[in-house]
């Protein structure tokens, strides 16, 4: 392992960690993240060592500008400057004596986003990408909005914790003697990214910047997408491989926002071997290892379980779009006007979090009972692959109304398992087309397909701005039917870890009801302390969101604390945030303190107001 810096054209330098194979020169694969490669994500090291030792790839890990041990300021996620930086990094890597000049790019979540973004920039040496659990559309399918509706519980998670994380110092041993000056620059000049996101409630040019959709033609290199049906970025699967005009490969499993080799739910597979085979094909002119380009796991009917370890089902392989796909339209009878209940949705998972502490879906009967529902008997196995749509004429009287649609599998014993869901911020009246999240599912004979419609999907997204009703007329459900062919070959995957990486110890995911005051509250939290290559680290996350079911007033509270202990410094960044929405605005207060041991280094206070869409 080698640590180095790449000097940018503007004089800033980016920290890079290199894992080099014994046989050189070799192709290089790049991952670039803001999550501090040398401490907070240093535990990911075994994967990079495997790429080098077992598969002969050089691996480069980079802290993006202003994060970890890289210079500059992290003014926002997915900055235009970040793409310029990484274009320079790719050129630097390609010019090294140990590199063949062929570069691939990969990454989970943030690293998947910028893999897509760099492919759109078309740097000369970038030959293939593998985005994992990422989205092609920053507005419709990220931690910020879902169908235009503000994500709510995510606001106390990533949307907040990046503020204190960005105020932590570079690793002194890596940066050198001026590390404290660089730390103080971060502390003095950074502002929370959340404020920028809240300032853009509509789908405007801000969100198109960094999104692949709708201009997929910008990508002209081979792209392998890894997606998970229990992850929040599952829509970047079928639709994306169908739209990119370059060789594509889809690997979609039952996984949450964790590595396919260790995720719950499984089955778990060795994704590193699959990625290496894909890079072999396009960085080394190797042979194609899959007979068909796309492989996904079709989940079969099963009981709901928030800590499910393994999903029943089968792997499918096919081209996409597939000749075995068709649409089936089902007319849903009109039902009486529905009075919106703001805390419907608690039995479902929290979409973008996708893993503990938020868990997987529980029994949906709790939410079904507070929704409009239609049940359709399933007399023989019924399989779908793709996105379900609900079209209807909707009249809503709530301020800032939404429509939330859930598709469920109801077993003979009455238990209701979530298959997919979709949420859309809507106008007071008009035609709507709600696209549910992509999935692959098979209902067993004797079960029922249930459609549930409500005016809230809380706490996944913010509830409407006040009480009201929802009326649907002329609703039609469109199912993406898939007829499986058992004779089609599927890859022989190497099994992943026998045990998942999810650990419920120390995890909080609680639902509370104040019966007298009619307030529902969801509480989340987790904490950990661990060794790092240069010291120790501690992370603590505590948050809750609430809704008054009479007035629809909603609150969010988040308390996040990071501590990094190096021989030179014990740095702590502690942030407390409160958000209130009770109508047309989000009122945000945030206070951050930064300490060196017991000594206060800086203190920031913000109070901002942002419009609701």
Where are these regions (language model features)?
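N-terminal cap/lid segment of alpha/beta-hydrolase-fold proteins
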Residues: 1-23, 378-380
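Proline/glycine-enriched tight loop/beta-turn segments at coil->beta junctions
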Residues: 12-14, 20-28, 218-220, 401
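Cap/lid segment of the alpha/beta-hydrolase catalytic domain
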Residues: 24-94, 143-144, 399, 411, ...
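Accessory cap/linker subdomain of secreted extracellular hydrolases
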Residues: 45, 120-218
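Alpha/beta-hydrolase fold nucleophile elbow
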Residues: 97-109
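Short glycine-enriched nucleophile-adjacent loop
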Residues: 112-123, 240
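Short beta-strand/loop motif that positions the catalytic acidic residue
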Residues: 219, 225-227
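C-terminal, loop-rich substrate-recognition/catalytic regions characterized by aromatic stacking residues
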Residues: 251, 259-260, 264-595, 599-613
């Amino acid at each position: 392992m080698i640590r180095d810096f790449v000097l940018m054209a503007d004089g800033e330098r980016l920290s890079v960690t290199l894992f080099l194979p014994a046989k050189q020169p070799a192709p290089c694969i790049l991952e670039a993240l803001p999550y501090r490669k040398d401490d907070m994500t240093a535990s990911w090291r075994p994967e990079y060592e495997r790429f080098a030792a077992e598969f002969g790839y050089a691996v480069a890990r980079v802290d993006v500008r202003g994060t970890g041990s890289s210079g500059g300021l992290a003014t926002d996620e997915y900055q235009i400057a970040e793409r310029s930086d990484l274009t320079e990094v790719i050129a630097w890597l390609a010019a090294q004596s140990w590199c063949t000049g062929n570069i691939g790019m990969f990454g989970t979540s943030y690293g998947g986003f910028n893999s897509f973004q760099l492919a759109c920039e078309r740097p000369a040496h970038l030959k293939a990408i593998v985005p994992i659990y990422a989205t092609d559309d920053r507005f419709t399918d990220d931690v910020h909005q879902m169908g235009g509706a503000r994500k709510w519980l995510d606001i106390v998670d990533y949307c907040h914790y990046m503020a204190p994380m960005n105020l932590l110092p570079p690793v002194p041993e890596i940066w050198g003697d001026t590390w404290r000056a660089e730390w103080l620059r971060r502390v003095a000049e950074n502002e929370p990214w959340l404020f920028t996101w809240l300032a853009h409630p509509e789908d405007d040019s801000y969100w198109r910047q960094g999104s692949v959709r709708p201009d997929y033609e910008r990508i002209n290199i081979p792209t392998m997408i890894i997606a998970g049906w229990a992850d929040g970025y599952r829509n970047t699967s079928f639709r994306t491989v169908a739209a990119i005009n370059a060789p594509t490969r889809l690997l979609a499993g039952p996984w949450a926002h964790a590595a396919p080799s260790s995720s719950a739910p499984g089955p778990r597979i060795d994704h590193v071997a699959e990625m290496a085979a894909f890079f072999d094909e396009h960085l080394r002119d190797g042979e194609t290892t899959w007979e068909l380009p796309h492989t996904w796991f079709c989940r079969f009917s099963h009981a709901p379980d928030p800590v499910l370890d393994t999903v029943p089902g089968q792997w499918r392989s096919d081209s996409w779009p597939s000749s075995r796909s068709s649409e089936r339209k089902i007319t849903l009878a009109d039902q009486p006007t529905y009075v919106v209940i703001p805390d419907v949705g608690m039995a479902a998972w929290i979409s973008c979090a996708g893993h503990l502490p938020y868990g997987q879906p529980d029994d949906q009967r709790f939410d079904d009972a507070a929704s409009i529902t239609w049940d359709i008997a399933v007399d023989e196995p019924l399989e779908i692959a793709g996105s379900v749509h609900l079209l209807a004429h909707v009249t809503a009287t709530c301020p800032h109304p939404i429509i939330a649609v859930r598709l469920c599998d109801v077993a003979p014993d009455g238990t209701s398992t979530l298959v997919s869901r979709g949420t859309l911020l809507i106008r007071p009246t008009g035609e709507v087309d709600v696209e549910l999240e992509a999935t692959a599912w098979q209902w067993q004979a004797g079960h029922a397909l249930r459609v549930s419609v409500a005016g809230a999907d809380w706490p996944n997204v913010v509830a409407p701005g006040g009480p009201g009703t929802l009326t649907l007329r002329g609703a039609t459900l469109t199912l993406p039917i898939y007829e499986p062919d058992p004779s089609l070959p599927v890859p022989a995957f190497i099994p992943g870890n026998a045990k998942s990486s999810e650990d419920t110890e120390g995890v909080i995911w609680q639902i509370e009801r104040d019966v007298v005051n009619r307030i529902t509250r969801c509480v989340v939290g987790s904490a950990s302390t661990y060794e790092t290559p240069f010291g120790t680290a501690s992370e603590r996350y505590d948050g809750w969101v609430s809704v008054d079911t009479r007035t629809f007033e909603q609150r969010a509270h988040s308390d996040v604390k990071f501590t990094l202990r190096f021989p030179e410094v014990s740095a702590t960044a502690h942030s407390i945030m409160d958000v209130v929405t009770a109508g047309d605005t989000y009122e945000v207060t945030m206070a951050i303190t930064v300490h060196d041991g017991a000594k206060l280094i800086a203190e920031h206070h913000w109070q901002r107001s942002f419009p609701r869409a």
